[in-house]
């Protein structure tokens, strides 16, 4: 059986491709760099900035309540999408440091058990991809069908344009072309903004599991220096914590890698995740209110059903892997006592106890310094949406 090649960076390829199309990967472009910078400026001015603006100007100025609600939900989503994209673009070079730390951790992977753990990552991230495809496809389909089955000339999303698109066929096609191209651009932004945190948190979980395995093997091989192995694992752990944001030496080294990696990732995804939690609660509430009280057209109802389901599913993978991170970080001190520590010298035991004290500190990714990226926050977001919905019910009474 062929040996699994460990390369965590392969899971970043689709994100770098997306960032390149979005115009934020200029430092990775070697040819036609000036042209790429021009493309980046124009595309982000026309879409990242102007797309939410052309939706926002039309807020509560539309012909029907259904159009007002569609306009509001799309405006909130696109605004959040643009802000998240700009935050990621501002900190994009941090991804290079994450990749450097991941390479160091990949080099530490040895043995069939650790490679088997890495092999499971492909399955998990493929399932994440299926979740996002399942989110986007029905919403896009019913948004398009709702647009096509309109009885009179209209836009895909209610919005403002500086020209008369209603009475001019040419302007009508220009407006719709802009909306279709713009929403495709924003969907790509949304994919990379929502998928990247899930991917990096999944990678952290897998590397923590592999570190756990390396801890258990410390001191079992008499031919290896147990103290150096332990130090290497501790260094790996520190690198992982920073990124999110012989045997003893290697274990300590791994511990340090984990610490650095985790802190780096947490800093990178913190504000975008806070924005996503807030917008999810708001849009789930609006979508439910639209279904119950306002929208009667069949296609529009189907759109809001899938939209209300899609919003929480966008944050679920990140919350799931954030919970998995916390669980495995919390078990590392058990792994330390699972190794062959009782036969080692005093220096080994001193370093191991130092590691145990460090690993007892809770390591949880936090969004905006306030909300844990955790399943508890996922359910709290749904509760927040329900609370807003009950306020709407009381206001109607």
Curated annotation (Swiss-Prot):
GO terms for cellular component: dendrite membrane; membrane; plasma membrane. Residues 58-68, 150-179, 296-301, 394-397 are extracellular. Glycans are attached at residue 62. One of its GO terms (molecular function) is odorant binding. Residues 1-36, 93-128, 201-274, 323-372 are cytoplasmic. The keyword Transcription regulation does not apply. It comes from Drosophila melanogaster. InterPro entries: 7tm6_olfct_rcpt. GO terms for biological process: detection of chemical stimulus involved in sensory perception of smell; sensory perception of smell; signal transduction. Odorant receptor which mediates acceptance or avoidance behavior, depending on its substrates. The odorant receptor repertoire encodes a large collection of odor stimuli that vary widely in identity, intensity, and duration. May form a complex with Orco to form odorant-sensing units, providing sensitive and prolonged odorant signaling and calcium permeability. Involved in the behavioral responses to ethyl acetate, anisole, hexanoic acid, and pyrazines. It is a multi-pass membrane protein. The keyword Transmembrane helix applies. The atypical heteromeric and topological design of the odorant receptors appears to be an insect-specific solution for odor recognition, making the OR/Orco complex an attractive target for the development of highly selective insect repellents to disrupt olfactory-mediated host-seeking behaviors of insect disease vectors. Odor-evoked OR currents are independent of known G-protein-coupled second messenger pathways. This is Odorant receptor 59a. Belongs to the insect chemoreceptor superfamily. Heteromeric odorant receptor channel (TC 1.A.69) family. Or2a subfamily. Expressed in neurons of the third antennal segment. Keywords: Cell membrane, Glycoprotein, Membrane, Olfaction, Receptor, Sensory transduction, Transducer, Transmembrane, Transmembrane helix. It comes from the Eukaryota. The chain crosses the membrane at residues 37-57, 69-92, 129-149, 180-200, 275-295, 302-322, 373-393. PANTHER family: ODORANT RECEPTOR (PTHR21137), ODORANT RECEPTOR 19A-RELATED (PTHR21137:SF35). It is found in: Cell membrane. Its main location: membrane. Interacts with Orco. Complexes exist early in the endomembrane system in olfactory sensory neurons (OSNs), coupling these complexes to the conserved ciliary trafficking pathway.
